Amino acid sequence: MLEKFERIKLGHFPTPIEHLKNITKYLGGPNIFIKRDDCTGLATGGNKTRKLEFLIPDAIKNKTEIVVTVGAVQSNHARQTAAACTLMGLKCLIILEQRLKNPPDAYMNSGNIFLDKLFGAEIKICPRSEDVEEYTSKVLEDLKSKGTND
């Protein structure tokens, strides 16, 4: 069924499944396994690589100028989207929802948000005081008013 959709290879699949012997033993069974999606390879890995393999070609086909995504400040999805866009030569705008009250500078400048910036994504922070859906709508309206992502 997936064959009818255009797809680009962004990850290393299938990812391994590993038996967690110690946890299985500790629990006295049943056998516990883990799917190692950290091994997908795209921007330190993650399960969102699979959907991006379909979404990015669709964006290219539709001549999308800027891929826009929304997530929390340390969003894995946002990081992987930024990486996929960079690989495919697309601009990426990430709207990050500030969920913490008075987060430390390290939180706002390290981890995934640091990687988002490294991948060249434009970052907009939705303040805690604003509704993220309304904030996103305003950003999208602004893009459209500039003739972007019609």
Locate the predicted segments by residue.
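PLP-dependent amino-acid enzyme catalytic core
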Residues: 1-150
